[in-house]
Amino acid sequence: ATCYTASNAIKITDTSATTWNGTTWSNGAPDLSKLAIINGNYDTTSHGDFECCSLLVNLGFTLNIQADDFVLIQNDLTNNGTLNVLNNGSLVQVNDLGVNTGNISYQRIASVKLQDYVYWSSPVSGFDVNSISPLTPGYYHWQWNPTILNPNGGEGNWVNASTTMLGGKGYIVRAPNGFSNTANQ
């Protein structure tokens, strides 16, 4: 079978589905030809990575993608439950036109020294820049503005960021106050 999506006029339903019930998949492991439905808690450490045509996480259930694990979705993601991507875990949505609905929580941990800056980019919108590192003073949160003049007479400079992150836009945040300049913490 092939992974199909709906057109404007006709929906071709050739995609089989498999449902996770907390213990096993109803129709074999998901693959790029199947809709994967999470109807029981799923953790990639215990149950493994998977690929699917589209993914549905039902209300009341949690999908945890752990460090060094992945879930690859060819098309659409509908999250009505809880979806957590932990540090160094990966959620990959292949189709640029794929629809992504629901909230996703990403955890990222950076090992930094006091004067280090970490570059962040928001794959999803709606996260407060100040929440990246609550112990870092707000005047060390920056975003790039390509339209203002810089001290060298060119265009583009860093400006203070005290806003909600926008998808695909980059930010830099300094390490929290109290961190050492000599040792990673």
Model-based region annotation:
Residues 1-7:
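Short, exposed coil/turn segments at beta-strand boundaries within extracellular/luminal domains
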Residues 7, 16-185:
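N-terminal exported-region signature
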